[in-house]
Amino acid sequence: MLDDMRVLREAVREYCVAATAAGLDWPDAGESPAGAPPDRVRRIFDVDHVADQLAWLQSQRWPDARLLPNGGWRMPWPDGGDALDYLGLSIGTPFPWRQQLPLFHFDFLLYTFVLAGEHEGEIWRYPVGEDAWESVRAAPSLAALFDQWTRGIAAGVVRYGEADKWLLVEDVEGVPGLDPLAFPVTPVAETLLHARQRECGASPVADDEGFEHQERLLDAIDAAKARLAG
C-alpha cells in the first residue's frame, strides 16, 4: 500500500535516529523535498507514474554508505534497461514482474518497490545469485518496513557491528512484534515463507519447476531490454 506521506516521513526519521543512536555514522542532512523521478524510470518499468512516496525517499540526501540492516544500501534511480536484470528471480509474483523497482540491496537479497496495481507500494524480496524461488512480500509498505527495522534496533536484535561499521541483524524469530521477513536474513523458515506467500498472493514454485519459470522470465527480460534499446 502507499503510505500517508506524514507517516512515511516519521517512520524514516525514527529509523535514522535509532540507527545513529546505535552507532551508525549517519550525519543529519535534514529532509529534502521530493524531486521528480527521471522520465526513463516509467519507460524502463512500463508504468505511467511513479509514486510520490518513492520519489520522496529517493530524494533524501543520504550518504553513500551501508545504512540499512545487514549492510544494505539504497539503490539510485536506474540508468537504463540493465536494471531489469535484477528482476530475474521475481517468479510467481501476483503482479507483472516488470512493474517493480530495485530499491534496497543487501548483497544476498534484493528488496523492490511495487510500482503499480493493487500491490503498489508493497516491498518484495528476492534472493540474489541463488537458484531459490522465494518471491515474497517483505512489508506492506515503506513505512511498515522502516518501522520494523526501528523496532529491531529497540529490541536489541539489530545492533551496530564495530568490525563492519554497519548494523547487523541477529535472530529475530520469536521476538514479539517483529516480522522476520522484513529483515534481510536468509534462509527463513519454510512454514513462514509459504504462509506469507499464500497471504500476499505469491505462487510458490516447486524446485523442479523453478528453472523453467526462470528461463521464460529471463527471455522476457531480454526482450524488454531489446525494445528499450531500439
Model-assigned labels for residue ranges:
Residues 60-178:
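Long, low-complexity, intrinsically disordered segments enriched in glycines and aromatic residues
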Residues 1-113, 183, 187-190, 194-230:
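A surface-exposed partner-binding patch
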